[in-house]
Amino acid sequence: MTFELHEPVLVIGLGGVGSKLATEASKYFNSNSLIISNDEKDFDSQSHSVHVSTKPVLNPSVQLIRGSTIQSESQIRDEVSQYSSVIIMANLAGKSGAAMAPVISQICKEENKSVIS
């Protein structure tokens, strides 16, 4: 199996761990990063971000986070539309990463992006 990474590349970080990994990986790939999370603490000033709101729930379930991610679909599509390749970084043991990764991957594939996750 071969995979070609086409420029421009977007590194997407999902949740807490994914956001940290994406910020570092974007430096390595000399690309932009996008942080998608339901926790505002995961955002930094260097990256574009999409806040997936799960308010007013304090401890949201995986299902709620996934549903809220689907509600943010148009904003996510706008962010990925300008890139050819997308690298998705997420901690699948965490709620945010496990909830968001399938949704984000599907959006990127529907937009005909080369996806590594």
Predicted regions and their residues:
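Tubulin/FtsZ superfamily GTPase core signature
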Residues: 1-117
